[in-house]
Amino acid sequence: MIFQSFILDNLVFLCMKIINSIVVVGLYYGFLTTFSIGPSYLFLLRARLVEEGTEKKISATTGFITGQLIMFISIYYAPLHLALGRPHIITVIALPYLLFQFFGNNHKNFLNYGYKNPNSIRNFSIQRIFFHNLIFQLLNPFFLPSSILIRLVNIYLFRCNNKFIFLISSFIGWIIGHTFFMKWIEFILVRIQQTNSIKSNVRIQSNKYIMSEFRNSMLKIFLVFLFITCLYYLGRVPPPFFSKKLSEIQETHEIYKKGKKIDVEKNLQRVQTKQKQKRSNNKEGFLSLFSKNENNLYKIDEEKYKLGFVKKPLVNILFNYKRWNRPFRYIKNNRFENVVKNEISEFFFHTCQSDGKERISFMYPPNLSTFHKMMETKFYLFTKDKISYDELSNYWSYTNEEKRNKLSNEFVNRAKVMDKELISLDILENRIRLSNDETKTKYLTKIYDPFLNGRFRGQIENVFSTSIQYEKNEKKNTILINKIHGILISNNTYKKNNSNYPELEKKINIFDRKSLVTTFFFFNLISKFSKKLVSSLSFETLSLFPEHEQVKINYEEEKKQIIKILFDAIRTDLNEKTIVNGNRTKCIRINEIRKKVPRWSYKFIDELEQLEGKNEAENYQIRSRKAKRVVILTNKSKFFKKYDTYNPTGDTDNAEKKKNELALIRYSQQSDFRRDIIKGSIRAQRRKTVTWKFFQKRVHSPLFLDKIEKPLFFSFDSFKSMKIFFMFKIWMRKKEEFEISSYTEERAKESSKKEEEKKKENEERKRIEIAEAWDSIIFAQVIRGILLITQSILRKYILLPSLIITKNIARILFFQFPEWSEDFRDWKREMYIKCTYNGVQLSEREFPKKWLTDGIQIKILFPFRLKPWHKSKLRSNEKKKDLMKKKNFCFLTVWGMEVDLPFSGSPQKNRFSSFFDPIFKELKKKTKQFQFFTFRVLKVLSEKLKLFLTILIEKAKRISKSIIESILKSILKSILSLTKIKQFFKLLFIKFKFKKIDELSENKKDSTIYKNNPMISETTISIQSINSVNCSLKKKKIKDLNAKRKAVIKKIEKIKKGLVISETNIHSNKTTYDSKRVEFEKKKLQILQRRRNARLTRKSHSFFKFFMKRIYRDIFLYISCIPRINIQLFLELTKKFLNKSIYDNEANAERIYKTNQSIIRFISILHKYFHTRNPNSHNSCDISFLSQAYVFFNLLHTRIININIYKLRSVFQYHGIFFFLKNEIKDSFFGAQGIFHYKLKHNNPLNSVRNQWTNWLKDHYYQYDLSKSRWSRLVPQKWRNRITEYRIAQNKDLTKCNSYEKSQLILYKEQQVNALKKKIRKQYRYDLLSYNFINYADKKDSYIYGYRSLFQVKKNQVISSNYNTYKKELFDIIDNLFIKNYISEDAILDMEKNLYRKYFDWMGINREILNRSISNPEFWFFSKFVIFYDAYRGNSQVIPIKLLFFSSNVNQNVSENKKNITRKKKNESLELELETRNRAKAEYPDQRNLESSISNQEKDIENDYVGSDSEKNSKGIKKKKDKNKMEAELNFLLRNFLILHLNWNNFLGQRIFNNVKVYCLLIRLKNLREITIASIQRGELGLDIMMIQNQKNLILLGLRKKKNNKFMKKEIFVIEPVRLSRKNNKQFFMYQTIGLSLIQKNKRKIYHKYPEKIHVNKKNFYKYITRTRDQKITEKKEKDNSDLLVPENILSARRRRELRILICLNPNNINSMHRNTIFYNPNKVQNGFPLLTKKRKYFEKDKKKLMNFKIFLWPKYRLEDLACINRYWFNTHNGSRFSIVRIHMYPRMKIR
């Protein structure tokens, strides 16, 4: 089983090795590249399908494979890659190839003459197929872009070490894949032919030769398809031969100027003769290397400059290979725009020596690599031995050991001298500084001194203005040294022109490697000095490294000669840039040392810069958003001379002649698709973007078209109009019946207004679209401008005169007087003013600039209106009315029409209406008069006809009555024999008949039948007469009949009365049936309404319950979170805060005390509430971040020791440096638990160690004890709720209230001194911190200069966890924590003189507010009060409480009397006044002056606060005062928190724009009176806005109306919040994260460490008692614990760090393993720690000696020192690896 598992493991390992090998990976990637099929496969497939013969198919495949092989080789071979990748080379190959292809396919016997055998290799058709496949494979990257699969090869090639094997294997993989692909295609084709899967269902009968023609035309079809693919790719990348040429930057040659040419040849001859005399025969070959030839060194190509241009190669002239083809942006910095490219990338790869080994660095300095390349090319003659890696590593370790020994010996010697008490200043090592003089009295400035460390390195503080002028001290001996100028001679010129070149080849072996290294060191030394006196250079003392002192004497002469050539032979003068020889007076010109740097070939400007006139380039190259330059004013006045003139041509002479212009830029409203792309480059091909409108603001994706409101092809306007018509009809019907309510009327008015606004918006939009359309069309503005001018000429001189002539001729024909003079007077009044494209008028004869390209408008002033007749002169009132109504201007269109606005779609109708309207009016009048006359005539006629007809009717009635009576008499006589009943009915019928006639003829109302019917009476009379004749016969019967007749008549009268009443009611005012129906409906609605109200009243109880639940859930649940607040107390507080004023100083103090007590009492309630809610969250810091310290501290509190800890005994007994475990934690914890050896165990018991741990945690991890405002920005809320924090009680006397800042200009020198002191103290603190870490174990030996162990328990130390512990905020932290005068005077540490401790730091409140974030719930409510709670509690006697809450502008009382300017000055902002006073007081920090000034300040505050009230005591002024207070608070919040960007385009308003247009016209005219009066009368010129006094009137004209929503919709008024960078205190967080190395002491540490603070002068509390070191020693302190000085300060800061790191390094162990390994075997490193295995006795024996070196150990995990370990000290490069973090360090050492 073991053997099988062994075999399986080996097989798996072998398989993994094979899979990960380069060959297999290359085969895999090569196989993948076959799937990247391009257009090169077209020729191959064509040869397989169409060509006949195996030779042609073989030639196609071989050509294809060779082309692919060349492409693979080009990946590895750089020159071939450049040759195939450059566009002009591809163009040279592609153009002849396409021509050859075209002629070869059109001519069958093209270049095949004389060859009869078609299958021979000499046949050109076979060769042509081969070259087709070969060349097109090379042109594949040109026609189609390389696919991802091909690019994978390039990517992996960079990672691979053995590149050539990878390329071969990938090529083989590609061949395998290609063969599989071709076989698969052949298989498919054969399968198709065998199975006949493609069958033609349609038979071709008309033409049998179509298929043969199709086969013959396959070549042409193929060419067309190839041409389409080429065009497709050319659309993506434009070819270089069709690209647009851009103007390049012209190089300025300053050497050759007019009048400054020097006779170069004469100077050359003199210098050459003198140099030849000094040359020695022995060193002739060597010196000739550094001398330049007569012909080529000093000779300048004058012909190049005589021609005026630099000679360029033909390729650069034909092909612009540097241009932008891709849609790249031209990014530039407007402030610092340079010609040189900033192409230094973030990574630069180069081989370097790191840790004694050669490694690839990706952060290598590019300048250094270029210098190495230059030196390698120039020193190719010297033989250079290759150095092995072992030699390099040994050399590196050897140099480090030597440095360490040298530094340690030097330090020990200095320390020994100090032990002998021979203290002198020479013992202390001074800083190395660069000097300019031998006496070392003058040094370089701190900014330019590289040996100085600190804040001066790399920083230049601009304290004063840059206008300080320094005098130039010209010295005779100061020169600029031309560095290594003789070395950098070009090799080609040297070989060609040097006659001594063959002699030099014999002397190549003179120089060996060491001599070359020494020369290089001298070159590096020389390069450090850019300006130096020649006499001060002494190279004998310059030996920076010890190994370079042992140089052979044989090469000293060579070095001297090299230096002599470098310094004495050729030097560059400062002023004239000439070459000066040391002892000569002649001057020679040479070319300086030059390096070809990446330069911008072009300096582009955008279209906006050209329009603004900033640059003087001829044409722009960057296409910006479409815009036009709108010229508002051109004038030669002095006011406009300060503006830059618009000079697109760049001619200064023409620019001076041109008028000064005041112009604006108008942007197009089209969508910007240019996107700052350079001319000639392609656009970015963006997918998923569609534009379906001609004018579209934004590009939309088709995926979201359903979410966008799209205009359809048809609209529903017709349906809307029909709907409106029907609504109007219904409304009219209802109007007849009942009235419309007022609500509906208002709605109708609003809808009509909206419709009008929509119409205006649509018209404006259409107008803009037309204007943009004219801009978008090519040459449209030229055509339009010419048409407008022709239309104006035709109108003025042809059309209008012809109309005048025809009108007057017509008047003559109608026998009226002609009006020639009146018409021509109006014709002459018409003016044609040329305007810009935007409508700004210039003058009648002045054309705008570039009007053919930019466009033109023609405005017609006082347009001619043809009138049929002219009236007499109107009155003045009528004239004013007409002028106000009419607009006496219009714009001319292309069609000759008149328009109110440019590009308006609706033309005016005034041209013909002015002529025909008066005629139509007169016709209307005449028709009205005629109608009135005819109406009167007809009325009279109608009345007369009515009378005539009535008379005729009456006569006819009378005649008819007589005739009827005679007829009746005859009838009665003839019918006497009939019965009585027949006679009765006949008489009754006649009576009814006549009754109806009488009733129709008479129209009287409310009359009886008898009164209205005289015929009845007559008939009765006639009947009575008849009865009287026959009375004797039938008297009784007639009486009976009369009675019956009367009864019937009465019944008829009753029926008639009902009918008459109904008829009269129709014409009366009483209600009809319809009105009754409407009333019934109203009653019905009222009944329903009553039912609904009753239903609501029934359900009101449940509804009220539901409403109360909602209120409780939404409102009162949130209010319940608010703590219990004393409302009465809060109201009293607000009353006192707002209404009380300051009268005297005593009353002020009483008021302040009361209000402070109330505020503190009020806010203490909030504090208690919130602290009692979460008793566990005493503070807002999270100690769980402590990782190691926190975990071990908790383990220490658990008295039960886990068994697993003993398993780590071997790990923790190792006294080396751990990667993830700090030694202090390990020793303190595990030493206490007894894991170490019993002799090495700590003597303290468990409780004392626990106290030490608590102290250690507080001292070392105080950075987690942040303030609430800062912790809230770092830690979330839930972490803060889980915190228990041990706090230390602080003394309130130690507060820092330094609230007075000092001015930089006055105290500049003091700041410099303070900065130096701070720097020294900071450095001293860091050193002491490192000693505290090293000496943590022993109390007695760890006390170094007054510092005790951080683990030492103190009696006065009090640990408390009370949540009411007063915690200091940001402005209470002590800034300058330092040791003051530590040698001569020892004061209480970290304590400063605080003269202003009684006064509150109110100047820093604004900064505090900005950095505070409301994170705790107590800040949700009354945040203004809680902000200053902790700060104001101990300082409540100086400044009024109002000044705390409003640090800005409390009394901005603006007086109504504007004339009283002095009162305004007195009532300025309080903040500025106090700032100036504080600055004055900072200059004189005297106690008496300070107290008096502060009392005066309080009085001034009172006077300012009460100043406005003392004069006017009315109630209105008090209200204004309260409003001003609230405005001050609002302005304070807005100024500090609200920062907005207003993109307000139309901020001036339409009236001001109209005024501007009129001003532009009036400025150009001489006689202004008539036009100004006319414009004022028309209302175009507003006198009220000609002088704008207040800025608010100018800005907020458009905002006065409530139309903000409208502006937001139109995108005119846009509020965009500015993305403000958060103002974080970077240094604070950096120091907090670094933690251990950069401790910034808090005040509570002062209480721990310095119990001497009790000794304070109580009378003068602002002073503290300073005591010297002797006084402290006499005060019962052990003399052994006080060290006079830290011995490490003997060395300088730089040497100190170097010594620490060299001691920590162990080159022997480091060389045994690689630096990048994280895990290693600790058993191999046991030899490096022999002391740890010895006994404690021996350890205690060497304890005193160890103490001397313990302080020099490099502090653990010092990130500052880690950053300093770089190649400058140990040839270690930090760019590639930061492996120095894993340096092994000695915890303890023994002096050997």
UniProtKB/Swiss-Prot annotation:
Keywords: Chloroplast, Membrane, Plastid, Plastid inner membrane, Protein transport, Transmembrane, Transmembrane helix, Transport. The chain crosses the membrane at residues 18-38, 64-84, 87-107, 129-149, 165-185, 221-241. Coiled coil: none annotated. Pfam families: Ycf1. GO terms for biological process: protein transport. Its main location: plastid. It is found in: Plastid, Chloroplast inner membrane. Involved in protein precursor import into chloroplasts. May be part of an intermediate translocation complex acting as a protein-conducting channel at the inner envelope. There is a partial copy of the N-terminus (positions 1-162) of ycf1 in the inverted repeat (ABC25181). Belongs to the TIC214 family. This is Protein TIC 214. It comes from Glycine max. The gene is TIC214.
